[in-house]
Amino acid sequence: MVKVYIENYGCARNRADGEIMAALLYLSGHEIVESPEESEIVVVNSCAVKDPTERKIARRIRELLDNGKKVIVTGCLPHVNPDVIDERVSAILGVKSIDRIVQAVEYAMRGEKLISVPDWKKRNLDKLDFPRLSPRNVYFILPIAEGCLNACTYCATRLARGVLKSYSPEKIIGWVKWAIKQGYKEIWLSAEDTGCYGFDIGTNLAKLIDEITAIEGEFRIRVGMMNPNHVLKFLDELIDAYKDEKVYKFLHLPVQSGDNEILRKMGRMYTVEEFEEIVKAFRREFPELNLHTDIIVGFPGESEEAFQRSVELIKRIRPDKVNVSRYSPRPGTIAAKWKQLPGWVVKERSRLLHRIRLQISYEINRKYIGKKVKVLIHGEGKKGNVDAVTMNYKHIILPEGRKGEFREARVKNAASTYLLGEIIT
């Protein structure tokens, strides 16, 4: 028996991969421990979407090795930039090789090194066929697909995850029923782009949501990020699916830029106007919609005028949250070859947009004060409070509440990133 600690980075999709590896190790007689200090081997389940994250992970790998730990690196980094991985690691597994984790651990304990980073074209895994060792949270992360149909010029994730492979609705429904039976109250539908789910197997996300909401039980669905160009193809159908009370009125719709020429250079395949069309359609039906979007600042060729169009867009649509990212060139991408903007320009634009988005978020959240909201208790938070979410997935801090309960609360105060409330029933 080997004591293994799994350290996950990046998206929910990656965390689900970590849970598969944990289950495979556990079922093979190994022990999954709660901290690296307790472990003999640390699995660093990496992310490579941004350069700062990549550098942080590379430093972490060196730190673990310097402290005498055996390290296995999994996730996207082995595909995107393997050169930054310390050569002292015991094994390197790509995202299509997580089923070899037991072999990697056993090799490592014998002092042998396993490297398996197959191209996505040569090896595919239906990850719903594998067991999961999931934390006893209120929510269950459920991957519905891997890969995407886009070819964004800045994104390296496609290099690792490949082209879209949707999982069958039957298997997804089976996992939802299992999760509800286990006591989970919240299902996260996760993918690189949930908006293109099913396009390769003759179905779509709206139909999948309809099948899930037909399942008996009190639970909620949180739909993950979707790209606008795919949503446009079935917008009315998706909005109809969202009308079910089991679906959180939460929409993560990344726009990435408010300038159409920059969107064209990014390879995003939609316009600012089309993005706004989707937002308006959702808000007409769901005035309480919690809208999240993403903006990349400092993309190659982004002029001051182009950046200001992004600022104007955010001021105009007023999202509940904007994830602001500074562009960083990723190995193997087209945009990495283009002339880059000075770092100080990118930093300045990021700071400006960040201030604007915090102010907008604060103003939106203040409007909730005094309102009665239904909440799902997620569990213990900081300072003796509990964390919960509203039915449009606003985070709310409460003084009491039992994990997994649906309760009624009243909002008493607000900050940019959360609400404060009290239980009333």
Curated annotation (Swiss-Prot):
Q: Gene3D superfamilies, from UniProt? A: Methylthiotransferase, N-terminal domain (3.40.50.12160), tm_1862 like domain (3.80.30.20)
Report domain Radical SAM core positions.
134-363
Q: Which reaction does it catalyse?
A: N(6)-L-threonylcarbamoyladenosine(37) in tRNA + (sulfur carrier)-SH + AH2 + 2 S-adenosyl-L-methionine = 2-methylsulfanyl-N(6)-L-threonylcarbamoyladenosine(37) in tRNA + (sulfur carrier)-H + 5'-deoxyadenosine + L-methionine + A + S-adenosyl-L-homocysteine + 2 H(+)
> In the Enzyme Commission scheme, what number(s) does this protein have?
2.8.4.5
Annotated residues for binding of [4Fe-4S] cluster 2 = C148, C152, C155
Record's SMART domains? Elp3
Q: Which residues form a coiled coil?
A: none
As to how many cofactors bind and how, the note says:
Binds 2 [4Fe-4S] clusters. One cluster is coordinated with 3 cysteines and an exchangeable S-adenosyl-L-methionine.
Residues of the MTTase N-terminal domain: 2-110
Binding positions for [4Fe-4S] cluster 1 per the UniProt entry: C11, C47, C76
Domain TRAM: start-end pairs: 366-425
Keyword NAD among record annotations: no
Q: Which cofactor does it need?
A: [4Fe-4S] cluster
According to the UniProt entry, its GO molecular function terms are: 4 iron, 4 sulfur cluster binding; metal ion binding; N6-threonylcarbomyladenosine methylthiotransferase activity; tRNA (N(6)-L-threonylcarbamoyladenosine(37)-C(2))-methylthiotransferase
Give the family, as the similarity comment puts it: Belongs to the methylthiotransferase family. CDKAL1 subfamily.
Protein known as: Probable threonylcarbamoyladenosine tRNA methylthiotransferase
Organism the protein comes from = Pyrococcus horikoshii (strain ATCC 700860 / DSM 12428 / JCM 9974 / NBRC 100139 / OT-3)
